[in-house]
Amino acid sequence: FDYLAKVVGQWAKDRQSETTAVLVRDRSQRERVVDALHERGVQTRAVGHGSIPPGAPVVMTMHRAKGIEFSKVFLFGVSSRSIPMGIKDYDFDKDEGDQALLRERSLLYVAASRARDELVVSWTDQPSPLLSASVSSVAASTS
């Protein structure tokens, strides 16, 4: 949460707060992120249903962000434990598992493509396997 607070706090100082979003996997994670940022002095607004309130960076689920563009996006918690979610439940049916994996991949694409100018992706422990090729190419290009 400290790195998230540092990045989002800097974006807010740069007057980018109204075009900034933190995207998370689910509603419970959204609430944890809002609380953690508040504890670190970074004001955000949780967005569920309805319009997006002006004045502060928003925190919303990846699903909720569909169709909305932001200047800067922080994808929080894109770890192997959270994305893809529930794929093991389809181990008994390959076709259903393939469809579920495609939906998870599409969700991650939608979330990442909400960023117009800057995208930051974070994870704990291991990154999502859906990021592995991208993470490898970024790591190679920055070393």
Where are the model-predicted features located?
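Helicase P-loop NTPase motor core
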Residues: 1-44, 48-52, 65
